[in-house]
From Swiss-Prot:
CC per GO annotation: nuclear body; nucleus; RecQ family helicase-topoisomerase III complex
Similarity field: Belongs to the RMI1 family.
Region (Disordered): 269-311
Keyword rRNA-binding: no
Organism, scientific name: Mus musculus (Mouse)
Sites of Phosphoserine modification: S225, S293
Biased composition, class Low complexity, residue ranges: 271-285
Name of the protein in question: RecQ-mediated genome instability protein 1
Length: 616
């Protein structure tokens, strides 16, 4: 008997006996495999039919990708389904009973109120209808996913059916909004199961997802409010900082508050980002005794990553350091976008232009004076498993931190005092008047720049852009002491250009990584007029951390010395949080990105240069 004739007979038998339709390619591969498994021995047609059916029952229909249901069944609000359809049960749950009580029974926990003597609810009367079971099934033909509801009690179904069980849906079936209303005469259980689904959609896991429990195989991320994080005083805990769970838990809160502030405040800068998720399509292939092709399982988020000494040539510090994600609501106030315009902004002006540096030389960070008291919660796994903090963060130079963040309430008052000592009020008023007297209609210009330079530059609101552009009239790209990103955006340089801007880190767009023996991290910076994606070079990060990548590898061999490396990471975290300085950036118009080559503290010479530029 030839393979082609055997395949044709099996296809006819499956359709006539079981109303099962399968792809011809899969059927041919299955018959060939059966013959190979039997050493090409002569098998009767009945034996081939039986083994093909067994293989189909163990196959995940999603891998076959052979549509059976009507294409528009999910689009119609209601209708009737007629005919025979062999479908697969991905999961099922009894929706007539609370999911919590069901999962407690599965776990063998006693939920009866034995200690409660009072009558908690009225006893049902004998004539009252008792609640009956109602199963909700997640069904698929391999392409279309639809729900099936136990409209009437179906004895053939029960909650113990393994995920991947095949059923035959037949007859005239009503459906409403993508839900089949199943009756006993509409369902016939064919059997089978799918190994992958048996673990993924086990009854306990399905119920746990319904009540909001996290998968025990995935690290738990507590939903801690930034106001309710307990304080830890002294010791190593205060040095290592908050755990990666806290950083990730607070990420959504800080992003939510930032989004609300962007909508509410007209002068605040805005930025948008998009992310795309791609799902690989598994090719149809045949594997004996199981699914046609194994479906790849997604790696749970925040899975701990362990590194060996030889794995640091190119690694991502998955749990790693960098910026604190427990920043409270962003304070994008008018003061930050309108320097030198109001009397109360005197201190802010001088915080920008006359901040006292720890060194007048080119340095890799800004050292700020004052009491910096921080109380942080520590992840114990960081010591034993060499894990790091996640590095995503948002940062504004005037943000306020909660109790367990880095708090330094004396900074503003200290800088205000320094500002008042440096510039007299008359000079401030003089500068303010000169700025306000330069009238230029910039709304059209700002909108044009925003459209033409949408990425990676992202323009601020028109009023913020207008106020910041008062200082940039007649400014070239090398005008001392610094220029604005909006000016660089407007000039549209054709070649790689090196400029100096006074900016701060808004957020890190990548993890701290080590590649080829060099540190690297990507970030989004802003000077209040626009945003720019940049890379920080190894020299800057090495200066902040205190150790190069080769030195870090040596420190890992000694637990005591490795502790100092972790302290260096924490120091780098604090420095990046407070980072607001002059940045020398090499901007490449072809890639629309920049490279931060140097960080420099603001000195008095920069203030004098700024005065000269304003007096022109």
């Amino acid at each position: 008997m030839s393979v082609a004739s055997a395949v044709l007979r099996v296809e006819t038998w499956l359709l006539a006996t079981w109303h099962v339709k399968v792809p011809p390619m899969w059927l041919e591969a299955c018959v060939n495999w059966i013959q190979e498994e039997n050493n090409n021995a002569t098998l009767s047609q009945a034996q081939i039919n039986k083994q093909v059916l067994e293989q189909w029952l163990l196959t995940d229909l999603r891998d076959l990708e052979h549509p059976l249901l009507p294409d528009d069944i999910l689009e119609l609000p209601k209708g009737e389904l007629n005919g025979f359809y062999a479908l697969q049960i991905n999961s099922l749950v009894d929706v007539s009973q609370p999911a919590y009580s069901q999962i407690q029974k599965l776990r063998g926990k006693n939920t009866t109120n034995d200690l409660v003597s009072a009558e908690t609810q009225s006893t049902p009367k004998p004539w009252e209808v008792r609640p009956s079971r109602m199963l909700m099934l997640q069904l698929t033909d391999g392409v279309t996913h639809i729900q099936g509801m136990e409209y009437q009690s179906i004895p053939a179904l029960h909650s113990g059916l393994p995920p991947g069980t095949k059923i035959l849906v037949r007859g005239c079936i009503l459906f409403r909004l993508g839900v089949l209303l199943l009756k006993p005469e509409n369902v016939k259980v064919l059997g089978g199961e799918v190994d992958g689904l048996s673990e993924e959609n086990a009854q306990e896991k399905v119920l746990a997802r319904l009540i909001g429990e996290l998968d025990p195989t995935v690290p738990v991320i507590p939903n801690n409010s930034i106001h309710n994080v307990p304080k830890v005083s002294g010791g190593l805990d205060a040095v290592l900082g908050p755990s990666d769970e806290e950083l990730l838990a607070s990420l959504d809160e800080s992003e939510e508050s930032a989004a609300n502030n962007d909508v509410a405040m007209e002068r605040s800068c805005f930025s948008t980002g998009t992310s795309s998720n791609t799902t690989p399509t598994n090719p149809s292939g045949f594997e004996p005794g199981c699914n046609i092709s194994s479906r790849p399982k997604e790696k749970p988020p925040n899975q701990p990553t362990h590194f060996t000494d030889g794995e640091f040539d190119d690694f991502s510090l998955e749990e790693a350091l960098l910026l604190e994600e427990t920043v409270q609501k962003e304070q994008m106030e008018t003061k930050a976008s309108q320097p030198l315009t109001l009397k109360e902004n005197t201190g802010k002006c001088m915080e920008i232009f006359s901040h006292k540096p720890s060194s007048l030389n080119h340095t890799a960070l800004i050292h700020k004076q004052g009491n910096s008291n921080f109380d942080e919660k520590t992840s114990e796994q960081m010591i034993h498993e060499d894990k790091f903090f996640d590095c995503a963060s948002t940062r504004n130079h005037h943000k306020r931190f909660s109790a367990h963040d880095f708090t330094n309430d004396s900074k503003i008052s200290e800088v205000d005092d320094a500002a008042q000592q440096t510039l007299s009020s008359s000079n401030v008023h003089c500068l303010r008047n000169k700025i306000l007297n330069r009238k230029l209609d910039l709304s059209e210009k700002s909108s044009q720049i925003s459209k033409e330079n949408g990425h990676p530059f992202q323009a601020c609101s028109s009023r913020s852009f207008e106020n910041n552009t008062y200082l940039s009239i007649g400014m070239d790209l090398h005008s001392p002491p610094f220029i604005y990103l909006s000016v660089l955006m407007a000039r549209k340089p054709k070649e790689v250009t090196t400029v100096t801007v006074k900016a701060f880190i808004v957020t890190l767009t990548g993890n701290l990584s080590s590649s080829g023996g060099f540190w690297g991290v990507t970030a989004k910076v802003s000077d209040g007029t626009a945003y720019l994606d940049v890379d920080f070079i190894d020299e800057i990060l090495t200066s902040m951390i205190g150790y190069s990548v080769p030195e870090m590898k040596q420190l890992r061999k000694d637990p005591l010395k490795y502790k100092t490396f972790l302290e260096g990471l924490q120091k780098c975290q604090r420095d990046l949080i407070d980072l607001c300085c002059l940045m020398t950036i090499s901007y490449d118009p072809s890639s629309c990105k920049g490279v931060v080559l140097e960080l420099q503290d603001v000195g008095m010479e920069h203030v004098e240069n700024l005065k000269k530029r304003l007096n022109k």
